[in-house]
Structure formats: structure tokens, C-alpha cells
């Protein structure tokens, strides 16, 4: 026992605890201390090394030997997860199983065959849980600034997904967003998903985020990020299962079953906990409780990829670092400090390598460190009292008042660090504080909760050790001044101003925010008034200079106090600021480009009718959009104006308010123009007219953008409101609106939309009409028995088919074969074969029939060598068979006289005897005889005979004359008869294929109609 005590004392003497994360970062290279508890190092599927929980790990040795210990008491609580709170189950998800299958097939290595519907449904249900987790974290992060941007989604991805998977998903999201920003040509005529290169619908995800109240304001980039992430996550999960040794292979092709799928996920430590139904996130271990490192943290893998010899670790160092990352319990704060030190020394370079939060990297001297309070908070959650019992100076307690958390719910240290770092990076802070650890505990442990982090002055307060004493003192005094103002006591304003430094009342915090901005965030009306009276700049802006203010949140750059008051919807404060002379457009100056959202844009996105009305009364312009900082924008006023934001979020009342205000302003301007024009000359009148024209074009473009977003997100009522103003349809907005109405079973709106199709210019026809439009319209025709809708769809199909003639059937030029003089036709003389047709003999010659077709050759083969072999033909009429023989003996169709009553039978006979040229000749005759009365009968016969060319011709006739045919009962029966497998044809499906081919030839080809 004494020997063990000396070991612990010696170990603790080697540990240092400072304001960072321990001093061992400088000396651990020389450390020979091994934290390994087991010699069992095995390779693991989707991680580095995993640690088996062997009996040796249950031993009560010193605390460093029990970092990963499974205590005996844990066996009683292994089933505790059954009592844990569960995630909410989603009734609707923003994807379909068809989209999931297409997303998987997007990668060639995943195209190995058809995935069963049950497997797709199970995969969808599991990944749905990851969506809920990410959305819940993004929802909490969005409370700070009252909106969900790509940064909130990105940080949520980092918190929920493992190191390796999050990097891949963020890369996919960034790629989708880059493609979207670059696809500015004809952007209102193409879907957001197409512009992003995604299979999943960005519009569905946006609508889902709004309906789920992820935030009162959702930026379209956030929806793109989440869509790209989830699509990538589906492929990531499927790839890992595909590469799992659990999946059996049949001739090299993976053979999936639900059992093998579940087993593969259970063995993957990066996916198992993520896809569990519980609210807390089980990380770093698989279903058997085996801990393992993810791919990106595997020292063996990274060392093999490292090109620098100096970066190599010895075997003992590798085991020490791995054990530090996988630690689940600690016995003291000193031990934890050392473990965090080792882990951070290894993780920090990887964090920089995969840095992707959108801000410039800090200098190496400003790497993220752990504040002492953060370490103490983490120690509280990781502390194991039993590990102190080995200390001879500590007597174990005789009475236990608390139950320990079982091992199965304790995350390894690397997961604590991952989540805490994600929170710190989201704040743009250079230090992890205690609240970051509490937020991590809320996520990683069952039954732990805490409030979301609020926007405070000390969020990013950090004093570098490289600052001299005077600078450090000034920084602390400034922080004290902000705290005094933040407490809400107006009597401390003057004293606080004296502490803020040279900037006085307009001094800025690390986040680039002034005391007035913080007061607006809190909605402290009295403090706002006091600060204004003290001389605070009412139009101060959050700076753009990242070098001086590295903790500025990107989405708040150039924000003013009015912006923050609107963000948090404090209407009395907004009223106060406007009365005091605040710029109603925020930081926007006349004639300047706007790189941040105006207060009216923010109010419109939130749907706050009262706030929108107030800003409009004060002269806010709803036409102003936002220019992206990369300079990409097709609109002179920027993108996503107030109209678009209200429409995108489905705030119909706000949208109507914006419209009514602009119409009122337009009337006032016109009356003023008329007054001025009374005494002006012609040149001045023309100038006013041109100005009005420019304004009208700008508004039309703004409303087109709003129409695009409302249709993408499924707010069809707003789309129709915009259409009623005279804004023209694009094919895309029309199709999206039609799809929404069909899904919502809104028959009157469907009828109205179908009637509007004729207003779409043919130049608008794109590939989307074929890939999305035709399947949708034929689905509506199949599902709806409404005569009005059927008639309208028939008119649309006829319009799409075009005025050009149906492609003609052409004769097949028969190759020159053996022929006999017609004199020998049915001539008994010299005949060597006799056919018995309807009981009558028909004489023929083998020399001719052997070369006529394979069918005749087969009939004549293996017959006795008798001179006049008799072959019975039972299903062909005598006169029809005579026409067939006449065709063969004459060598063509010129001498044939075919009656209309015989052509169908002759077509069947020519098909049976495999005489293609004669068959085509009969098909041409049938095509000439087609009319509204005979078309259905001929079509059914052609389908029965499997004559594709004639069937396609008749389908063209159907489409060209569908407006008339849809009224006829035989045609209705043909369309709506339920197809039986391998029996009746699916006519609607065939019509869709024929129409798609036609549209490609006359609308999408370069010749535009010459190919028919």
C-alpha cells in the first residue's frame, strides 16, 4: 500500500496546473509514464485503436491505471439507458426514400445493386435522429443572435458528429454552398438543389427548419449547409456499413440484410451512439462499450501519413496519448490537467489543419487554452471518488450519498474536448470556459441540462500572457466597466465610462460591440436612454477588422444598436432608438452597397408585423438586399430583400404589409411627378418616366426573387399573391407550386395553376420539365379523376407535344433474297411443302421459305424428307396467309392489295412469321387509318403484338389529340385501367416517355423543332 502511495505522490509531483491546460505540453515527450491498462491492441473498423475492457482494467491500482476502469458497481446499471430521455420522433422528414436512394447512387462505389425498401427505411429512420440532434444544437446556438446561419449549423455539426465524420460533412456542405453562390446565371429558373449539386431538396430543408422553429430567422445558407451535411451523412453511414467485415459478399457484391446492417452500426464507435434514440450523445464507444479513436485521431494512421520525421511518436508516447484521449474518469484535478495537456498538445495541430469556421486562423501563440474554471467544472463531471481511496492519506467514506454515473454513459476525454472546443470556437474565443464544459455535459451525459448561452460581454474575454502589466490592467478595467453597465444599474454609468478606456462610452469589447449594443440586446430601455444621454454613438457599427477584433461574429459585422434591438425584437428599444435619430437602414449609407441585413430585412424574416410596420413608417426601404462579401450578386440592390425574406419564411401578412407600403409610396411619387411635370418641358417628363421605369423593373426583379423563394419553400399562397401582381411564371416556380398544391390536396389551386401553364414561354422549357414536370403531371392525372383537371392536363400535354406532325413510319427496304415467279404461287406443280390453312391446302417451295425468315426456317426444319410435307397453320386466316405468300413470291409489297379489314390480321401474321418489312408496311397502313374511333383498338392490338414503332406513333397521336380524346369513354378506360403486371400496359407511363422524347427533340435540341 505504501508503495502505491509513493507512486501516486511521485506522479502528482510531475503534474502542473496553470491557467492553461497543464504544463506537461512542454515536457511530455520525455515522459516515460504509461497509462496503458491492457496489452490488447486490436485494429478496429472505423477508428484507430480500441481498448477492450478486460479483467485487468477492473483492478484497483493507482488512479492513472484506472482512467478507463470499469467499476464492479457498473454492472448493476448497464441497463440505465432504458430510463434515459429519448429524442422526439419526427413524423415528416425533409427527404423521401427515393431521394435517399438517388443520393447513395451518386457515388459510384456505392452503386452495387438495388437496396431494399426496408433497408432504406431503416437507414432513413436512423439518420433522422442525427438530424434532430444537429437541429437541436443549432436551435440553442441561434438564440444568441436570433437567427440561424451557416455558422450555427456548422458548429452544431462539430458538436454532434465525430471528428472524422464532421470534417467530411462540412466539406460537402461547403462545396454545395460554393456551387450555389457561383450559379448566378438563370438562378430563378433552376432549383436550389440543382444549383448546389445536391439530390436532397434545399427548399424542403428550409421549410422544415422554419416549421421546427430552429430559429425565428433561417438564412438560406444554413439550409444549404444542413442539406449538404445530411446527404453526405447518408453516404458516410452507408459507406461504413458497406466496408464493414460484417456484410457478406456474394461474388464480390455486398449482400445486405437488416441484421448485418444493424450489426455493422453497432460495431462502429462513431455511429453507434449518434444513431441511438436517447437525448444524450453516446460517443467514442460501440455497443459493447469498447472505446476507440476515430480515424482522424488515430496516431498510427497519422504517423504513417506524416512526412516529417520530427513529428513521429515513440510507441510509449502513442499509447500515452491514446490513453489520455480515451480517459473516462479521473481521481484529481491535477490528473485531469495533465490529461488535458497531453490531449490538447496532440489535438490542437489537427484542429488548425481542419479549421473551417470561416474566420482567419489565430496566431500560433493564441491557440485555444483551458481556463481554470473549465478544468474544475470538467473534473466535477469526470471525478471518481473511489480512485482517491488508494491514497493512504485519504480515508474512504463509510456512507455513500451519491450514485456514480455508470461507465457506459461516461464519454472519453476526447469527446469532452471536442464538444467544448466547438462551443469555444463558435464564440470565436481563445479559451474554453466553464460554460463550454457545462454545455458539453448537457449533450454527453443523461439527465444533465443547462440554459443556452446568452450574448454577454465576457463571452470572449481573454488576457494573453504576452501582454504587459499595464495593458493587462487596462483590459481588466475595461471588462469591469462592461460588467458594471451590464448589471442594469443606471447609477453606475459615469463610473463605468471612466473604466472603459480611451474609447469611453463607445469602447468596444472583444466581440466588437459597444455598451449600447449590449443594452439593446438585453432590451434594457432605461440603460439605453442613459447611454444615449451620456453621448453613446447611436449609429456605431461592429467593425470589420478581424485583426483588431478577432472575436467578432461574422454575421454581426456592420451591425448597429438598432440591428441588435431588432434581432431580439425589443420594440420599445427600437422605438427609442428611432426617436433618437438612429439610421432606419442600420449601417447603410446613401449610394453605398449593403453587406449586412438591414433592420427591415431582419424584422421581415422574423415575421414581426408590428416591428415591420414601425420601420416602414420611418422610411425603411423593402427593396434593399444584401451583397455577399465575395462580391457575387446579380441584383444591383443585393439579394434576399425584405420581400424575399418574408416570402421565404411564409409570413404572408408581413409580405402584404410590405406590398401595401410600397404601393402607397409609388402613388405618392407619381402624384408628385405629375405636379412637377405640369410646368416642365418634354425632356424632364421623359426623365421622370425613365426613372419610374427603372423603379418598376427593380421591383419586378425583387418580386421575382420573392416568388422563387416562396415556391421553393412551399408557401404557395404567397406565390399566388405575387403572381396576381403580374409577375410572370418561370417553369420552376410553376412546377414547385403545382407540386405543393398536389401534396396538400388543394384541388381548386391545382386547376388554377394548370390553367396558367399556357402563360409560360417555350423558352422557359428546360430539362426540369422532363425530369420533374412530366412525372408530376402524370402523377396528378393518374391520381385525379376530376374531369376539369384531366381536361387541363390534356391541353398541356398537347401544347408540349407541339404543332409539328407526328414522326412518320418509314418503309423498311427489304434485302434482296431468293424469289420465285408469281406463277408458282400456290401451284401444286413442283411444290415441296404444303401448308394446311383453315382446312385448305396451300402449296409452297422450301427454297424460298428457308431464306424468308427464321420462323419459316424453324417450321421447315426437322421435317420428314417426304416430297409434300403438310404443315398446319391454325391461327392465320387463309386469305391473310395468301397475302403473306404473295408478298414473298413477289418480293415486295407493291403488288399487294390489302383491305382495311385485313390489315390487322396481316400485321399479326407478319409479326408471327418475322417478316419485318411486311410488318412495317402494315403499320404504315394502320397509321393512316387511325382516327378518334379506331385509335384505342389499334393501340391495344399494337401493344399485344409488341410493335413498339406503331405503339409510339399512336402515343404521339394520343398526345397530339388528347384534348379531344379525353372526352371519349374508350380512351378514359384505356388511361385509367389499372395495369396488371406482365399483362396490361401502363399507358400513362408510356405516354410520359413518348412526350419526354418529343420535348427533347423540339424544345431542348439545338434545332428547335426540326427533329420530330
Curated annotation (Swiss-Prot):
> Which cellular compartments is it found in?
Membrane
Tell me the GO molecular function terms: protein heterodimerization activity
Question: The organism sits in which domain of life?
Answer: Eukaryota
Q: Name one GO cellular component term.
A: membrane
Q: Which InterPro entries match?
A: Ankyrin-BTB/POZ_domain, Ankyrin_rpt, Ankyrin_rpt-contain_sf, BTB/POZ_dom, Histone-fold, SKP1/BTB/POZ_sf
Name of the protein described by the UniProt record: Ankyrin repeat- and BTB/POZ domain-containing protein 3-B
User: Gene3D superfamilies attached here?
Assistant: Ankyrin repeat-containing domain (1.25.40.20), Histone, subunit A (1.10.20.10), Potassium Channel Kv1.1, Chain A (3.30.710.10)
Q: Where are the ANK repeats?
A: 511-540, 557-586, 595-624
PROSITE patterns linked to this entry:
ANK_REP_REGION, ANK_REPEAT, BTB
Q: Where primarily located?
A: membrane
Transmembrane keyword on record: yes
Q: Which UniProt keywords apply?
A: ANK repeat, Membrane, Repeat, Transmembrane, Transmembrane helix
Name the membrane topology term: Single-pass membrane protein
BTB domain sequence ranges? 831-897
Source organism of this protein record? Danio rerio
Q: Does the keyword Repeat apply?
A: yes
Sequence intervals crossing the membrane: 160-180
Amino acid at each position: 500500500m505504501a508503495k502505491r502511495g509513493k507512486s501516486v505522490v511521485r506522479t502528482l509531483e510531475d503534474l502542473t496546473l496553470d491557467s492553461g491546460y497543464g504544463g506537461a505540453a512542454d515536457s511530455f515527450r520525455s515522459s516515460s509514464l504509461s497509462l496503458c491498462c491492457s496489452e490488447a491492441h486490436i485494429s478496429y473498423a472505423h477508428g484507430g485503436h480500441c481498448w477492450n475492457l478486460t479483467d485487468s482494467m477492473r483492478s484497483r491500482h493507482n488512479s492513472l491505471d484506472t482512467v478507463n476502469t470499469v467499476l464492479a458497481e457498473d454492472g448493476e446499471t448497464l441497463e440505465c439507458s432504458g430510463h434515459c430521455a429519448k429524442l422526439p420522433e419526427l413524423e415528416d422528414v425533409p427527404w423521401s426514400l427515393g431521394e435517399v436512394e438517388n443520393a447513395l447512387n451518386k457515388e459510384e462505389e456505392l452503386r452495387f445493386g438495388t437496396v431494399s425498401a426496408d433497408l432504406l427505411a431503416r437507414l432513413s429512420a436512423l439518420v433522422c435522429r442525427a438530424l434532430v440532434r444537429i437541429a437541436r444544437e443549432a436551435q440553442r446556438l441561434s438564440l444568441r443572435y436570433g437567427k440561424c446561419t451557416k455558422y450555427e449549423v456548422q458548429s452544431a455539426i462539430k458538436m454532434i458528429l465525430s471528428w472524422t465524420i464532421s470534417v467530411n460533412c462540412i466539406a460537402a456542405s461547403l462545396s454545395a454552398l460554393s456551387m450555389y453562390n457561383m450559379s448566378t446565371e438563370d438562378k430563378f429558373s433552376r432549383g436550389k438543389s440543382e444549383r448546389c449539386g445536391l439530390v436532397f431538396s434545399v427548399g424542403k430543408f428550409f421549410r422544415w427548419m422554419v416549421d421546427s422553429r430552429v430559429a425565428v430567422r433561417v438564412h438560406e445558407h444554413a439550409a444549404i449547409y444542413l442539406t449538404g451535411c445530411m446527404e453526405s451523412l447518408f453516404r458516410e453511414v452507408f459507406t461504413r456499413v458497406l466496408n464493414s467485415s460484417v456484410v457478406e459478399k456474394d461474388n464480390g457484391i455486398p449482400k445486405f440484410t437488416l441484421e448485418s446492417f444493424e450489426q455493422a452500426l453497432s460495431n462502429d464507435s462513431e455511429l453507434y451512439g449518434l444513431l441511438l434514440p436517447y437525448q444524450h450523445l453516446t460517443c467514442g464507444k460501440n455497443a459493447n462499450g469498447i472505446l476507440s479513436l476515430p480515424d482522424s485521431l488515430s496516431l498510427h494512421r497519422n504517423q504513417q501519413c506524416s512526412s516529417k520525421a520530427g513529428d513521429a511518436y515513440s510507441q510509449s508516447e502513442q499509447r500515452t496519448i491514446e490513453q489520455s484521449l480515451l480517459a473516462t474518469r479521473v481521481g484529481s484535478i491535477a490528473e485531469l490537467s495533465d490529461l488535458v495537456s497531453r490531449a490538447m498538445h496532440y489535438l490542437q495541430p489537427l484542429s488548425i489543419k481542419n479549421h473551417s469556421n470561416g474566420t482567419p486562423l489565430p496566431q500560433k501563440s493564441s491557440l485555444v487554452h483551458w481556463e481554470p474554471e473549465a478544468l474544475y467544472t470538467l473534473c466535477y463531471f469526470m471525478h471518481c471518488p473511489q480512485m482517491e481511496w488508494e491514497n493512504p492519506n485519504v480515508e474512504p467514506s463509510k456512507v455513500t450519498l451519491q450514485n456514480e454515473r455508470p461507465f457506459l454513459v461516461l464519454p472519453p476525454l476526447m469527446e469532452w474536448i471536442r464538444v467544448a472546443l466547438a462551443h469555444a470556437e463558435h464564440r470565436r474565443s481563445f479559451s474554453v470556459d466553464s460554460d463550454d464544459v457545462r454545455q458539453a455535459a448537457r449533450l454527453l451525459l443523461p439527465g444533465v441540462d443547462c440554459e443556452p448561452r446568452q450574448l454577454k460581454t465576457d463571452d470572449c474575454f481573454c488576457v494573453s500572457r504576452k501582454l504587459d502589466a499595464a495593458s493587462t490592467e487596462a483590459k481588466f478595467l475595461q471588462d469591469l466597466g462592461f460588467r458594471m453597465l451590464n448589471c442594469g444599474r443606471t447609477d453606475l454609468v459615469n463610473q463605468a465610462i471612466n473604466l472603459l478606456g480611451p474609447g469611453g462610452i463607445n469602447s468596444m469589447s472583444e466581440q466588437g460591440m459597444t455598451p449600447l449594443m449590449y443594452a439593446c440586446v438585453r432590451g434594457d430601455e432605461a440603460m439605453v436612454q442613459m447611454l444615449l444621454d451620456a453621448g453613446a454613438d447611436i449609429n456605431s457599427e461592429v467593425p470589420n477588422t478581424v485583426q483588431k477584433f478577432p472575436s467578432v461574429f461574422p454575421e454581426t459585422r456592420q451591425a448597429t444598436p438598432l440591428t441588435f434591438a431588432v434581432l431580439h425584437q425589443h420594440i420599445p428599444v427600437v422605438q427609442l432608438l428611432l426617436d433618437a435619430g438612429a439610421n432606419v437602414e442600420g449601417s447603410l449609407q446613401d449610394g453605398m452597397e449593403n453587406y449586412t441585413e438591414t433592420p427591415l430585412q431582419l424584422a421581415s424574416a422574423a415575421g414581426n408585423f408590428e416591428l415591420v410596420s414601425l420601420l416602414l413608417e420611418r422610411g425603411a426601404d423593402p427593396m434593399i438586399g444584401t451583397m455577399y462579401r465575395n462580391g457575387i450578386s446579380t441584383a444591383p440592390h443585393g439579394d434576399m430583400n425584405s420581400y424575399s425574406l418574408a416570402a421565404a419564411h411564409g409570413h404572408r401578412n408581413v409580405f402584404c404589409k410590405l406590398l401595401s407600403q410600397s404601393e402607397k409610396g409609388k402613388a405618392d411619387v407619381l402624384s408628385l411627378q405629375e405636379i412637377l411635370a405640369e410646368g416642365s418641358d418634354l425632356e424632364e417628363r421623359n426623365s421622370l418616366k425613365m426613372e419610374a421605369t427603372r423603379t418598376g423593373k427593380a421591383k419586378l426583379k425583387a418580386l421575382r426573387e420573392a416568388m422563387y423563394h416562396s415556391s421553393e419553400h412551399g408557401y404557395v399562397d404567397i406565390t399566388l399573391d405575387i403572381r396576381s401582381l403580374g409577375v410572370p411564371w418561370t417553369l420552376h416556380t410553376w412546377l414547385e407550386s403545382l407540386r405543393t398544391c398536389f401534396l396538400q390536396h388543394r384541388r381548386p389551386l391545382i386547376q388554377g395553376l394548370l390553367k396558367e401553364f399556357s402563360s409560360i414561354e417555350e423558352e422557359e422549357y428546360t430539362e426540369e420539365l422532363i425530369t420533374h414536370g412530366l412525372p408530376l403531371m402524370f402523377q396528378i392525372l393518374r391520381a385525379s379523376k376530376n374531369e376539369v383537371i384531366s381536361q387541363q392536363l390534356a391541353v398541356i400535354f398537347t401544347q408540349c407535344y407541339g404543332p409539328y406532325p407526328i414522326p412518320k413510319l418509314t418503309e423498311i427496304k427489304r434485302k434482296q433474297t431468293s424469289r420465285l415467279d408469281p406463277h408458282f404461287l400456290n401451284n401444286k406443280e413442283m411444290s415441296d411443302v404444303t401448308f394446311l390453312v383453315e382446312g385448305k391446302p396451300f402449296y409452297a417451295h422450301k427454297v424460298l421459305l428457308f431464306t424468308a425468315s427464321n420462323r419459316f426456317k424453324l417450321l421447315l426444319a426437322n421435317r420428314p424428307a417426304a416430297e409434300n410435307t403438310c404443315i398446319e397453320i391454325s391461327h392465320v386466316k387463309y386469305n391473310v396467309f395468301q397475302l403473306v405468300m404473295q408478298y414473298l413470291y413477289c418480293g415486295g409489297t407493291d403488288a399487294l392489295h390489302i383491305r382495311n379489314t385485313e390489315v390487322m390480321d396481316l400485321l399479326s401474321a407478319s409479326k408471327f412469321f418475322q417478316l419485318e418489312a411486311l410488318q412495317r408496311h402494315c403499320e404504315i397502313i394502320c397509321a393512316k387509318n387511325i382516327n378518334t374511333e379506331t385509335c384505342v383498338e389499334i393501340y391495344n392490338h399494337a401493344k399485344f403484338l409488341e410493335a413498339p414503332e406503331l405503339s409510339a406513333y399512336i402515343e404521339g397521336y394520343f398526345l397530339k389529340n388528347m384534348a379531344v380524346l379525353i372526352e371519349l369513354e374508350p380512351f378514359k378506360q384505356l388511361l385509367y385501367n389499372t395495369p396488371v403486371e406482365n399483362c396490361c400496359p401502363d399507358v400513362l407511363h408510356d405516354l410520359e416517355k413518348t412526350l419526354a422524347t418529343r420535348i427533347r427533340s423540339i424544345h431542348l435540341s439545338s434545332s428547335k423543332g426540326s427533329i420530330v
